């Protein structure tokens, strides 16, 4: 299977004096710009994460190219004595506030150490910007207020990674996907379950939603309309050789109908993070969904390789996912997607930031729906 033609493919973060992992991408439509985030690490190891870095990309519509500016450190996104991980950006379109959520972990304490000792030392943090990421606030530790007593019931937790979601409910609620390793048994290994952090007051206060099925880890959420109902669909990494999908009809508080989507394969033994977004359907008419879903993930069933895109034109139906189209051949891992409006061929435009070349670089891809799924795209 050959890789599809794309509008742009460019390396945004490259290993050298530092390694870069865990991409997160945010499109700001009013600015026609992208913010690409990643962890800067001393090496590829998780415990060698240090800071969160950012590159700004300006989309030039006449040339259909993104011009990337120099790399900068989000210096405020850290707690003293901690390393910053899992960048999760979110733009509140109603207030103009840009949030960057992340987790902070002391020194080089690993996830495995927290699972073995059953001692949770991870903190949930945010910084905010009111000038589209040019300057940032001091860090705010949300852990105690957002999690409360349940913190002691977890061995560790994380957010995202990747973009978060603002809903189209009356409150324009903010949703931050997450997962926690819960100590459900006094002796057995803690079990991971996905959930969401929720704010109904533009980030002033935060609540914790209920857990999805067990054995769900890194996840992302998207909002779709099904008839008269808005649904938040959650797509999670699992150890079960396939993705887990679940739906919420109360804005991410509760998730029902957790399903294993066998078409969305997970490479053994631990699976891999993936990205999901909704975007306006190119089809109109009675019975046509208002949004479709796009999902990116390694397509190889045995290893982290061959980045693919999957389309769901009847969301959130798990059986409606397409076969994948190949975005990039070879080694790949984590990715993050953004919808960027309309492309030069009149079909929806997407940006994808993904890990490539055995974690040696993080690459930006830009492509249209018509390039990826020509048979599916019908002009209005």
Swiss-Prot record:
It is found in: Cytoplasm, Cytosol. A motif (FRIP motif) lies at residues 20-23. The active site is at residues 46, 334, 355. Exo-alpha-sialidase that catalyzes the hydrolytic cleavage of the terminal sialic acid (N-acetylneuraminic acid, Neu5Ac) of a glycan moiety in the catabolism of glycolipids, glycoproteins and oligosacharides. Recognizes sialyl linkage positions of the glycan moiety as well as the supramolecular organization of the sialoglycoconjugate. Displays preference for alpha-(2->3)-sialylated GD1a and GT1B gangliosides over alpha-(2->8)-sialylated GD1b, in both monomeric forms and micelles. Hydrolyzes monomeric GM1 ganglioside, but has no activity toward the miscellar form. This is Sialidase-2. It catalyses: Hydrolysis of alpha-(2->3)-, alpha-(2->6)-, alpha-(2->8)- glycosidic linkages of terminal sialic acid residues in oligosaccharides, glycoproteins, glycolipids, colominic acid and synthetic substrates; a ganglioside GD1a + H2O = a ganglioside GM1 + N-acetylneuraminate; a ganglioside GM1 + H2O = a ganglioside GA1 + N-acetylneuraminate; a ganglioside GT1b + H2O = a ganglioside GD1b + N-acetylneuraminate. Substrate binds at residues 21, 41, 179, 181, 218, 237, 304. BNR repeats lie at residues 127-138, 197-208. Its EC number is 3.2.1.18. Expressed in skeletal muscle, fetal liver and embryonic carcinoma cell line NT2-D1. It comes from Homo sapiens. Optimum pH is 5.6. It is an enzyme of class 3 (hydrolase). Changing residue 270 to E: No effect on enzyme activity. The lineage of its organism: Eukaryota, Metazoa, Chordata, Craniata, Vertebrata. SUPFAM superfamilies: Sialidases (SSF50939). Belongs to the glycosyl hydrolase 33 family.
